[in-house]
């Protein structure tokens, strides 16, 4: 799902939260470096040799 606001493209991902009976949650994609301790979700796997798959946390 993509939503456009104020002349910029905002990427919004809708994922089912399995801990809450699959309630759908919206996550806004941000383009920045991660910090130690943060969790990330793989959404666009580019390298076929990468050990992670789309949806991995």
Curated annotation (Swiss-Prot):
This is Uncharacterized protein YozW.
């Amino acid at each position: 799902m993509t939503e456009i606001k104020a002349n910029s493209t905002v990427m919004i991902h809708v994922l089912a939260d399995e801990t809450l009976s699959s309630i759908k949650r919206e996550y806004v994609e941000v383009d920045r470096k991660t910090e130690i301790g943060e969790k990330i979700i793989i959404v666009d796997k580019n390298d076929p040799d990468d050990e992670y798959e789309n949806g991995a946390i």
